[in-house]
Structure formats: C-alpha cells, structure tokens
C-alpha cells in the first residue's frame, strides 16, 4: 500500500522518538525511513489488501477468511499479533506512527539485530521484513 501520511511531520518525529525510547543507535534512522517507504509509502493508515494466515503463511484476498487471518497494517506493515508481541507498554495503537515504529524496532532487534541486516532493503527484489 502506497500513500502519504496525513501528518507528514509526525513520521520523522516518530522515528527519532522511537530510537530514543528503544535505546538503539541513531544509525537506525535512515534505515527506518527506507523501510517505511518500502512498506507503506509513509502512510500510517496503510492496510495491505491481502489477508495472511498467521500460522501457515497462506494468503487470501477479499474479506477476512476467519480467525487467525491478518492484514499487514500501519507504517511498517506489521501483522497484529507481531505488533502486540513487540509493542512497548502504553504504545498499543498499530496506526500510531510512534507505536508502530517502536514495535518495528523491537521486532528488527529481535530478528535481525540491526536494520542493515534486512535482506535486500532498498534494493530490487525486497520482499518485506
């Protein structure tokens, strides 16, 4: 999903605030900007039209097929269960730029260590993180 954030100023602020709140190095900033452009185009309200079964990875379009199916949502296109697992206390709104950025940073730390390690980020063939 591509779009433009309704409050463009809030997105860079969210990145710098999330970096401070999570304690990661400022070197994360450019990568987080690159990642949000690839994932949502900077639109905190973005929702991928494809439903994904969180357990099997199976995909479907149209309406929600049933329990356990989610859409990638928000700036960093997180699935709801992943967002909940990595959200910070008090930052539980998947559509809030700061909350989504914090959860994304926490997920990236856990899975990749640093966003520089996300395969093909910023290159042709990038397929999501």
List PLM regions with ranges.
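Intrinsically disordered, low-complexity extracellular "stalk/linker" tracts enriched in Gly/Pro/Ser/Thr
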Residues: 1-8
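Peptidoglycan cell-wall recognition and remodeling modules
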Residues: 8-129
């Amino acid at each position: 999903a591509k779009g433009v954030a309704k409050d463009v100023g809030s997105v860079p602020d969210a990145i710098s605030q999330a970096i401070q709140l999570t304690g990661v190095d400022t070197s994360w900033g450019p990568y987080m900007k690159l990642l949000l452009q690839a994932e949502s185009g900077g639109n905190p309200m973005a929702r991928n039209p494809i439903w994904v079964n969180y357990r099997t990875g199976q995909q479907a379009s149209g309406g929600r097929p049933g329990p356990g199916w989610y859409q990638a949502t928000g700036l960093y296109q997180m699935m709801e269960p992943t967002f909940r697992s990595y959200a910070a206390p008090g930052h539980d709104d998947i559509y809030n730029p700061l909350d989504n950025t914090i959860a994304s940073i926490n997920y990236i730390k856990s899975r990749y260590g640093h966003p520089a390690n996300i395969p093909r980020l910023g290159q042709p063939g990038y397929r999501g993180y």
